[in-house]
């Protein structure tokens, strides 16, 4: 019985460590030896919520717009490091969920809130240029796009087409290490 308890406890601790994925473990747990990025498990429960953006799309030719909620998470140590040094450490992972929104009148007023997931993005900090031959890695980051429910990245190049064009959205924040941080000041402190 004692042996069973020790084995069970070890498995539970191991599962918890894998789900939390500290920055020191990123390249052992979330990134394979060729640079393929996996979506971390349970990041909503174990990582730090950085903030949200409510984003209205540009009007389509028919004048329609959509509204999305962008919600961002990272590992707790990445926040501690950022507060101290003003940058994300090697192995930091930023996860951005893009969700559709619903809007309805509530007793407190007209409210918009996140609804169905549309896509999930990940950025993995790489200060050592580990994957120079992989087009999904450039400018000090690994870039990934995940469809909801699929832990396999759809990104083959960070300068791809459509939603896989990470470069197009991040070029305005190139001077800020390619990250939009203005919505995270209450957490990051800078």
List each language-model region with its residue ranges.
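N-terminal signal peptide c-region/cleavage motif recognized by signal peptidases
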Residues: 14-15
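Sequence context surrounding c-type heme c attachment/ligation sites in exported
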Residues: 21-24, 31-32, 39, 43-48, ...
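Secreted/periplasmic proteins
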Residues: 49-72
